[in-house]
Swiss-Prot record:
Annotated family: Belongs to the acetylglutamate kinase family. ArgB subfamily.
Function as written in the Swiss-Prot or TrEMBL entry: Catalyzes the ATP-dependent phosphorylation of N-acetyl-L-glutamate.
Listed HAMAP family: ArgB
GO biological process, any: L-arginine biosynthetic process
Organism annotation: Mannheimia succiniciproducens (strain KCTC 0769BP / MBEL55E)
Descriptive protein name: Acetylglutamate kinase
EC number(s) stated in the UniProt entry for this protein: 2.7.2.8
InterPro entries reported in the protein's UniProt record: AceGlu_kinase-like_sf (IPR036393), AcgluKinase_fam (IPR004662), ArgB (IPR037528), Asp/Glu/Uridylate_kinase (IPR001048), NAGK-NC (IPR041731)
Binding of substrate, residues: 43-44, 65, 157
Cellular component GO terms held in the UniProt record: cytoplasm
Length: 257
């Protein structure tokens, strides 16, 4: 099977029991299957918590975090430090051979500033898969934070969904986006197994998909179009279902290009 990139939402990092469940499922899966796995993560909630403790303002423009030069070191510390090493520690506990990385390591991606008004925020594209191919070939579990470096050597914050998409494109992998939702629900609150672009557009127009779910669905749709394959939105709360998800079954909603 193709490798699988698992994108983790930051809320998971605030939920120790959920992390335990996730890595229990990963360990169980790796004992029974040979599919290479990678994790890509953000950690916005950790950043917000750290900024609050330091009495620093959180600025946003059109819903995107503004990252001024005097805050990028704090954000790097939260994402590439606290968040990444917390996940590495959990994976090590379950003997999963984790390696903590960022998007700049081994020239995995090319980063370009997204919008000067957002400061140290970048978009990334796939660049060099050699490091990941070597790690996966030796049965390591790469855990990659959404921190990048641009051509000028500047540290950059990257949207974690976009980072996961670039990593999946880099190694021709499938992508699963894990969060705290079961998937996309219809007007009767029943889970929809699969959706395509036209169906998503209609559900948004009908106000069935609203608010934060629009962001999640559009991120998955963007990824599906880039990867030219279905991208799953699923919940990390059900460890008994995660092993099936990692094996390719739909437990949430599959977003097709």
């Amino acid at each position: 099977m193709k490798p699988l990139v698992i994108k983790l939402g930051g809320v998971l990092l605030d939920t120790p029991a959920a992390m335990e469940n996730l890595f229990t499922a990963l360990a169980d899966y790796q004992q029974n299957f040979a599919r290479p796995l990678l994790i890509v993560h953000g950690g916005g909630c950790l950043v917000d918590d750290l900024m609050k403790r330091l009495n620093l303002p959180v600025q946003k423009k059109n819903g995107l975090r503004v990252t001024p030069a005097d805050q990028i070191d704090i954000i790097v510390g939260a994402l590439a430090g606290i968040a990444n090493k917390t996940l590495v520690a959990q994976a090590a506990k379950f003997k999963l051979n984790p390696v903590g990385l960022c998007l700049a390591d081994g020239n995995l991606t090319q980063a370009t500033q997204f919008d000067p008004e957002l400061g140290h925020v970048a978009m990334v594209v796939a660049k060099n898969p050699a490091l990941l191919n070597n790690l996966l070939g030796d049965a390591f579990l790469p855990i990659i934070s959404s921190i990048a470096v641009d051509d000028n050597g500047l540290l950059m914050n990257v949207n974690a969904d976009q980072a996961a998409t670039a990593i999946a494109a880099l190694i021709n992998a499938d992508l699963v986006m894990l969060s705290d939702v079961d998937g996309v629900l219809d007007a009767n609150k029943q889970r929809l197994t699969e959706l395509n672009s036209a169906q998503i557009e209609q559900l948004i127009e009908d106000k069935v998909i609203t608010d934060g779910m629009i962001v999640k669905v559009n991120a998955a749709l963007d990824a599906a179009k880039i990867l030219n394959c279905g991208v799953d939105i699923a919940n990390w709360k059900y460890p008994e279902k995660l092993t099936a998800l990692f094996a390719g079954e739909i437990i949430g909603t599959r977003i097709n290009p």
